[in-house]
Amino acid sequence: MKIYDCFMFFDEELILDVRLNILNEFVDYFVIVESKYDHKGNKRELIFNIENYKKFENKIIYLVHNDLPYNIKKLNKRDSKNTIGLKSFHNANERENAQRNFISYGLKDADNEDIILISDVDEIPNLDSVDFDKIKSKIIVFEQKFFNYKFDLYVPNFTWFGTKAIKKKNLKSPQWARNIKCKKYPKYR
């Protein structure tokens, strides 16, 4: 059984470096998806550079998401501010979901019993005490500390349910896993 750590990347180079170093001993592969578009649909330059992460080069599966989703709602000049806001929110979610679902291309060589971790780059699970071989649940939700954008902005008494772990055979899509709520699944810190 291998462990694939899968997430999207935008410009969080420091957090990416921290994540790779913390999870390196537990993870077999890091699946990193970077998009040529931001969530507003603007074209952007790719910034991921494998030269900055040579230590992890053999573990990194780097994918570039080139496409915009097909179901983007066109903004019209006659739309009300409310409609523009709703369409913009919808479009941003569709772009994010398409980028996250692109993770699937990095899992083509994964076996059905391999563990797939789905999260954002800044949601770093604590894998120190997790024995995936002993867990019988189909889905695991990680209970994580919440930091508001920076490591020094810890929010006490607030629990974040971020990373999801699931065997490949049970994974419908990366976004499906992301949307799972923690109500009926075991939680790990």
What are these model-derived regions, one by one?
Residues 3, 24-38, 55-61:
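Short loop->beta transition adjacent to catalytic acidic/histidine clusters or analogous donor-positioning motifs
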Residues 11-15, 22, 99, 113, ...:
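Short, glycine/acidic-rich beta->alpha junctions
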Residues 27, 57, 113, 136-137:
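Short, well-ordered alpha-helix to beta-strand connector turns
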